[in-house]
């Protein structure tokens, strides 16, 4: 499946839903490109739902780290939601699970931002 990212803004929080394989050949910079669009409009809170991400390689891990860095440099926050055990295992190996706040789903991540699901 070709990698896609769907975005929805809710009360100054952007929900990004990633679908497919987050790899060098498929993921490219789609997440970061959307983050740049929304941060340019003043949004600083993001939830990245990875529930439908089938696979992540080293490029995908690096892309997540770059997204985190971009958002943090602008004084924002990015939380992960719906991370599968397979993807979480990769994040743990790369120690990114210590960088991101990880939630079971979008509702829990929204609550962490103080919003109703």
Question: What name fits each language-model region?
Answer:
Residues 1-17:
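Short beta-strand/loop segment at the start of cytosolic alpha/beta domains
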Residues 10, 51, 107:
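Conserved catalytic submotifs in the C-terminal HATPase_c
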Residues 85, 107-108:
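Acidic phosphotransfer microenvironment of two-component signaling modules
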Residues 101-105:
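Short acidic-hydrophobic, aromatic-tinged amphipathic segments that line or gate anion-handling sites
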Residues 108-116:
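Short, charged, intrinsically disordered terminal tails
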Residues 19, 106:
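Residues at the C-termini of beta-strands that transition into short coil/loop
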Residues 22-100:
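Amphipathic alpha-helical interaction surfaces in cytosolic regulatory modules
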């Amino acid at each position: 499946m070709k990698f896609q990212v769907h975005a929805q803004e809710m009360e100054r929080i952007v929900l990004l839903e990633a679908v497919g394989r987050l790899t060098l050949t498929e993921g490219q910079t789609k997440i970061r490109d959307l983050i740049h669009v929304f941060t340019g409009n003043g949004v600083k809170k993001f939830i990245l739902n990875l529930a439908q991400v089938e696979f992540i390689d080293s490029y995908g891990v690096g892309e997540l780290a770059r997204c985190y860095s971009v958002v943090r440099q602008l004084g924002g926050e990015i939380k992960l939601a719906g991370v599968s055990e397979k993807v979480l295992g990769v994040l743990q190996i790369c120690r990114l699970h210590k960088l991101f706040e990880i939630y079971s789903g979008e509702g829990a991540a929204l609550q962490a931002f103080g919003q109703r699901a």
